[in-house]
A protein has these predicted regions:
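Conserved phosphate-binding/catalytic region of the ribokinase-like
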Residues: 55, 61-65, 85, 110-210
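Ribokinase/PfkB-type carbohydrate-kinase core domain
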Residues: 6-146
Length: 210
């Protein structure tokens, strides 16, 4: 569960309790539930618990043995500070698609410069999607850098879930074999929907928006 305070400008402060998420263990990960899908999506939050971390590593091994894509989100700035070295090893060895906001990616490569963070993303030789709030997002794939414009909304009501819905829209595009620019546009559409109202669940079927 999560207690969220939302300001008038839509920014929010969260106090998160992971609850049952901390009880996930390797025994809960069944190959047949994973290999029937195209992409696995892992949350950095789960690195806060050793059992959950081992469960995610088991999922990574299953995906790699089945040649599945693995997506990973850095989740939170403080999460990066706690697990930077573990994340570094995971990113460099196992991940195909990385999601982060601007502050998280800068923290991961320990720089205050966004340009240097983009250079770091280029060096990873994978797809890296970096969200930048009202400045849209940047998708990096090796030396290719694609700037994605934000989808405008009448009013930003609540930014809770914006990063999650961005990832959902992006991965929807990847699963549909769309080019990275289109994936980024889908991501922006999904994020725009979620920030236009209170709560982190969409009020419409997202596939109807793209």
């Amino acid at each position: 569960c999560c207690t969220i305070f939302v300001e008038d400008d839509g920014t929010r402060t969260m106090c998160t309790f992971l609850g049952a998420g901390t009880l996930i263990s390797p025994e809960d990960i069944h190959p047949e539930h994973i290999t029937s899908h195209k992409i696995a999506y892992l949350e950095g939050y789960l690195w806060d618990n050793q059992n959950a971390k081992m469960a995610m590593k088991k999922m990574v091994d299953i995906c790699k043995s089945d040649n599945q894509q693995i997506a990973f989100t850095l989740s939170d700035l403080f999460c990066v500070d706690r697990h930077r070295e573990s994340f570094k090893e995971l990113i460099e060895n196992d991940i195909d698609i990385l999601f982060a906001n601007e502050d998280e990616i800068k923290a991961q490569c320990q720089t205050d410069s966004f340009d240097k963070a983009v250079d770091y993303a280029k060096s990873l030789n994978m797809i890296v999607a970096i969200t930048r709030s009202e400045n849209g997002s940047v998708v990096v794939n090796k030396n290719e850098v694609i700037e994605i414009n934000p989808v405008q909304v009448d009013r930003v009501v609540d930014t809770t879930g914006a990063g999650d819905l961005y990832a959902a829209g992006f991965l929807f595009g990847v699963a549909k074999n769309k080019d990275l620019s289109t994936c980024g546009h889908y991501a922006s559409i999904a994020a725009a929907e979620i920030i236009s109202h209170y709560g982190a669940r969409p009020l419409v079927k997202l596939s109807n928006l793209v």
